Amino acid sequence: RARYLLLLMIVGTWQILKQAKLEILAEALPIPILFESRRKKLKRFLKLEILNIEKIWFTCLKEMLKQQERFTIKGLVYIAIDQTSWGAINILMVSLIYDKRAIPIYWEILDKKGSSNLEEQQRVLGKILTVLSGHKIVVLGDREFCSVSLGKWLQKPSLYFCLRQKQSTNVKTKEGIYQEMRELGLSPGTQLFLKDVNLTKEQGFGQFNLAGKWKKTYRGFQTKEPWYILTNFGDLETAIIADKKRFDIEEMFRDFKSGGYSLEGSQLAPQYLSKLIIVIAIAYTSATMQGKKIKDMGIQKYVTRPEKRYKGQRRHSSFYVGQHLYHWLQLHQMFPKNIEELMQISRYRLKDYIKGQRAISLALSTF
């Protein structure tokens, strides 16, 4: 129970500080003991044997996934595999796509720089397929995970995949000739879908479907090249819709770093960093789900700046709303007498204040 309470305080403190460095977290942790004692308490917490992905995080995930309507899209669970790195740290991660963001599911800190290999990719995905057994899964990967060997390994019942391919990858034409994908004849504004094609000149890989598209513009800029997707989906549109969700894991990495928790500033050794990511995963998931509830309740305008819905304006993510909720509620609870007196003075705004108080009550119900 004491560990659980400490975890809740760490998560709440993190939402406000947006810093992953232990010294900064220890400064603000609301436990009435000496600073040095708080710092040591945090270090001991990160050394706990029970604080590991399979014992703690997998248990949370299995409980969340019971709410299938929340995490599935037309009966499918979308997961993305990607890497992020800074300095000597190199993390291979698989995440669950949720509400235009991604929730970390499993990760490994690689003891090398550069791209992961097939064995490492199969290992992390294998862990996930066990946790998600019973669900129809779509695996998404960028060109770093373009291996046809990975595609073959993913050809299993109730499992779909969309893996971006390099333009230099060879594809066998109807005439039996191999040519690079860049030679398939796509031009800006065109697309293609090839069924049952052989990729690469190596033997034994079987056939796949290949989707290709060259958008004229992306976010107002002309695109320089087309993209190609290795998939076992049966049509172009389904493959394109699925592949677009892959970008959500990149948004999650941004939230983990400078856009949210400043994970790269933790300066922890890999064995402690992996445990820290468990806590961040809990904090991130909590903020995202709370933010989604705030949006659904229609009280987002009390927490963050109202969204302008003209073209090009990026909307606030549920994570952004959920994280900023902590700031508003914390300061509200710090100045109850001031707020009460202000309401008495500004009687002409009383109706607005009452609406705001109701919004606060609704916001508190998300905890």
Report residues per predicted region.
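The alpha-helix within a helix-turn-helix
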Residues: 26
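Single, function-defining residue in the core of a domain
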Residues: 1-21, 56-58, 72-77, 88, ...
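Active-site- or DNA-interface-adjacent structural scaffold in DNA-acting proteins
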Residues: 15, 29-32, 36-87, 141-142, ...
